[in-house]
């Protein structure tokens, strides 16, 4: 059985073109979502996936109707394949029921994976270059080294941690991370406050 899926985009608010193409392709049932593909919660797609059985084919007008990212598409088509369900995209000439269609889709998947790895590699190289220039990522430290040392001296003088945390406007947990307490000190701090 051929099951169709249509989705509107922000550019094309009418599904008639998609719907007509799916009807001409022989789809017996068509499910529809009237929202952008950026949302992951698509009730029409969920209903279509639930309806599909082994041997059926999910048909879309174009790949981007099914998912915005290649990673999502490959994951979805992989799930379909595991369930014994084929996939067809009319305008992209992809049909996973044939060996050539499966091969073409795998090549697209490999290219998407390579692109993702290249992005990670470039990001890591950029971060390393920034570190070499003395730039550190993340937010600037709340206190200077001297302020942390001063906070440590206050704690050593017996000032309660809560009070020191208030003085320096830091969370109590941050203070514990910078100046770990011995077990006896923790119990004393709890009794004082």
Swiss-Prot record:
The protein's induction, as recorded, is: Expressed in the late phase of the viral replicative cycle. Expression of late genes is activated by the viral late transcription activator C.
- PROSITE patterns xrefs: RECOMBINASES_1, RECOMBINASES_2, RECOMBINASES_3
Q: What InterPro entries does the record point to? A: Homeodomain-like_sf (IPR009057), Recombinase_CS (IPR006118), Resolv_N (IPR006119), Resolvase-like_N_sf (IPR036162), Resolvase_HTH_dom (IPR006120), SSR_resolvase (IPR050639)
Compartments it resides in: Host cytoplasm
**The keyword Cell membrane belongs to this UniProt entry's keyword annotation:** no
List the stretches of this chain annotated as a DNA-binding region: 138-183
The active site is formed by: 9 (o-(5'-phospho-dna)-serine intermediate)
Checking Pfam families in the record gives: HTH_7, Resolvase
The Resolvase/invertase-type recombinase catalytic domain, residue ranges: 1-134
* Keywords from the named record: DNA integration, DNA invertase, DNA recombination, DNA-binding, Host cytoplasm, Hydrolase, Late protein, Ligase, Viral receptor tropism switching, Virus entry into host cell
- Under Enzyme Commission nomenclature, its number is 3.1.22.-, 6.5.1.-
Name a biological process GO annotation: DNA integration
Record-level GO cellular component terms = host cell cytoplasm
A single GO molecular function, which one?
Answer: hydrolase activity
- Record's keyword annotation contains Hydrolase: yes
Share any extra remarks. The orientation of the G segment is defined as G+ and G-. G+ orientation provides S-U fibers whereas G- provides S'-U' fibers. S-U and S'-U' dont have the same host range (e.g. respectively E.coli and C.freundii).
Protein role: Performs inversion of a viral 3 kp segment (G-segment) that encodes two alternate pairs of tail fiber proteins thereby modifying the host specificity of the virus. Binds as a dimer to the viral gix sites which are 34-bp palindromic sequences that flank the invertible G-segment. Catalyzes site-specific recombination in the presence of the host factor Fis. Gin dimers bound to each of the gix sites and host factor Fis bound to the enhancer come together to form the synaptic complex.
Q: Which family does it belong to?
A: Belongs to the site-specific recombinase resolvase family.
Subunit text? Homodimer. During inversion, two dimers associate to form a homotetramer.
Q: Fill in the domain comment.
A: The dimerization region is in the N-terminus.
Which protein is depicted? Serine recombinase gin
Q: Which organism is it from?
A: Escherichia phage Mu
